[in-house]
């Protein structure tokens, strides 16, 4: 057995054992059986909200148990596969590639197990705002929107566009997405901040290099179990006509809704629904989410300066730099993680940055 394959097997074996312990295996399998039995009762969906929470818990347990079982099977099968592949370089290469993928899944699962914040497992709202710079920044905002949509799609997450304002010539001024999937908020919360792009502008006839900025804000979708008190008198409601894609209802009625929480100057808006009532309900959910995120930021501020009060979108407040010319490099300014695969990153391959940010935040919390 080659040293590389032996090392991969040991890593997978260690990860599987760690994940098994974190699951509390016997308790987890028993709870999964209980939830499965409950879900088969005729009256299970009488309380839809409670039923959905139980189904999410069941799916999370089932996924965790299945992953451990798969990793343990990979380890158990490896010696036999090694024997079959003896002397066959192609089969050995395939086995090593399979084990590398398993080791990568295990490493990510170890990190995901560290997502222990009270809202880390939730869906999230992700808002993108173009900085100053007109068309350049607005085009950059649309590139970021596509990056996050592609990331979500690759993970099997759902994405809903709740609000979007088109740019004057190209791109978007702002967009709000709802990312739906297990740990969506936990993974994406570190994306909050200013993202900087350096490139030769496609809008500049002189082909000069331009620097553009867009900001990203992330907040968890919260349910009624998390209490967020909002005084209705503190909220201003504005309605306006929806814009952008939306079919026959666009621009016919004032169906879009904007809410402004006056004490914090927090603004949310929604135009995805077909009626003002739907958009108002969703906007209130978004506002509760944003105010809850502000509270989380206050709690994190002592340990993490990146969650200090909002600042202007500019050079001094970046979390990541994307350079396309004169060289190609994406670099996270907090973790120092970087890659020259700019096209891959802009196509949604951002897991290396998310994992590094999570690992750094966990390490910092342990040192605090």
Swiss-Prot record:
Keywords: Cytoplasm, Methylation, Protein biosynthesis. Its main location: cytoplasm. InterPro entries: PCRF, Pep_chain_release_fac_I, Pep_chain_release_fac_I_sf, PrfB. It comes from the Bacteria. One of its GO terms (molecular function) is translation release factor activity, codon specific. Peptide chain release factor 2 directs the termination of translation in response to the peptide chain termination codons UGA and UAA. Belongs to the prokaryotic/mitochondrial release factor family. This is Peptide chain release factor 2.
């Amino acid at each position: 057995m080659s040293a590389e394959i032996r090392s991969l097997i040991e890593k997978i074996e260690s990860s599987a054992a760690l994940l098994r312990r974190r699951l509390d295996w016997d308790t987890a399998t028993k709870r999964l059986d209980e939830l499965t039995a409950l879900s088969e009762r005729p009256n299970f969906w009488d309380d839809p909200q409670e039923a959905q929470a139980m189904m999410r818990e069941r799916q999370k347990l089932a996924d965790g148990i299945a992953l451990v079982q798969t990793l343990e099977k990979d380890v158990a099968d490896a010696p036999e596969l090694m024997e079959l592949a003896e002397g066959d370089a192609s089969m050995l290469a395939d086995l090593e590639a399979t084990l590398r993928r398993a080791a990568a899944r295990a490493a990510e699962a170890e990190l995901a197990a560290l997502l222990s914040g009270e809202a880390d497992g939730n869906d999230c709202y992700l808002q993108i705002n173009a900085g100053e710079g007109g068309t350049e920044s607005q085009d950059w905002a649309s590139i970021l929107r596509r990056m996050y949509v592609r990331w979500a799609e690759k993970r099997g997450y759902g994405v809903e566009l709740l609000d979007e304002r088109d740019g004057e010539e190209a791109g978007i001024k702002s967009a709000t997405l709802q990312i739906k999937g297990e740990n969506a908020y936990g993974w994406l919360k570190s994306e909050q901040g200013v993202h900087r792009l350096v490139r030769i502008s496609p809008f500049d006839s002189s082909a000069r290099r331009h620097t553009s900025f867009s900001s990203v804000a992330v907040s968890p979708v919260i349910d009624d179990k998390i209490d967020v008190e909002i005084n209705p008198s503190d909220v201003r409601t504005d309605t306006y006509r929806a814009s952008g894609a939306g079919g026959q209802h666009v621009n016919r009625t004032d169906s879009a809704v904007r809410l402004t929480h006056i004490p914090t100057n927090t603004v949310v808006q929604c135009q995805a629904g077909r009626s003002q009532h739907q958009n108002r309900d969703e906007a209130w959910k978004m506002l509760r989410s944003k105010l809850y995120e502000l509270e989380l930021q206050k709690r994190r501020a002592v340990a993490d300066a990146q969650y200090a009060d909002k600042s202007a979108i500019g050079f001094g407040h970046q979390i990541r730099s994307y350079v396309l010319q004169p060289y190609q490099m994406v670099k996270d300014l907090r973790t120092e993680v970087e890659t020259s695969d700019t096209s891959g990153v802009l196509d949604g391959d951002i897991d290396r940055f998310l994992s590094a940010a999570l690992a750094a935040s966990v390490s910092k919390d342990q040192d605090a």
